Amino acid sequence: MATEIADGVWRLDCGGVNAYLVFDDVPTLVDAGTPWDEGAIRGGLSDAGVDLSAIGRVLLTHYDLDHVGTLAALTPELDAPVHAYGFDAQLLRGYRTPPLGNHKGLIQRLGGLVTDLPELEIVGVRDGDAIGSFTAYHTPGHTPGHVAYVSEELGVALLGDLVSESDGELTESGWVISYDTGAVAASVRSLAERAPAFDVACVGHGDPLASGGDEALRRLAATL
């Protein structure tokens, strides 16, 4: 099921996780659910009136089973570059494996057993890169290569799992699902300082905020 939360911004509800469709310079898929969410992604795009083949790029906030899971299943109809950052991009390419010495790395290794790697072009992202109207901000902690994307033009922030939503407020990624909670807190503070104003906060878990997203991020940052 897809819901338009702002002009040109659609939430693709995959049950326990969100993906998004953003009409930027090209139709842009943001994250891709779990390996079991192919039907939800396809159905959500159909609800929004977009063919899978029309997707011009994929923006990944990070590598996790519930954010990259359908990419392999969506090809070859999906034929678009996938933008990902650093270590997470290396995981998606199959060049690296998550470290066993970190509890989150172990979770990722287990998730990798049921997650196929996509045969798609993986484009490395760097902090400050402009991708369409979005700017990439490296926000490590939940994963080493977690990245948020903010479009000043659209007033939209794609926050992935840096934060989640609960009762209309943003909450930082917790220890159980993060590599480094100290880095999470630093990333929240940094993004709150660096990002331009935005209304819409698209989160991986919970409900997206349709207004006041930047204010909610600053409120959270002030507590960390």
Residue ranges and their predicted role:
Residues 1, 219-221:
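Terminal disorder- and signal-encoded targeting elements
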Residues 2-48, 148-165:
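Conserved beta-strand hairpin/beta-sheet module of binuclear metal-dependent hydrolase folds
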Residues 27-58, 103, 108-120:
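Pre-active-site segment of Zn-dependent metallo-hydrolases
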Residues 28-30, 59, 82, 156-158, ...:
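Residue-level marker for buried hydrophobic side chains located in beta-strands
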Residues 35-36, 87-138, 144-216:
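Metallo-beta-lactamase
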Residues 38-84:
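Active-site metal-binding motif and surrounding structural segment of the metallo-beta-lactamase
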Residues 79-86, 103-105, 158-160:
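Short hydrophobic/aromatic-enriched beta-strand-loop microsegments
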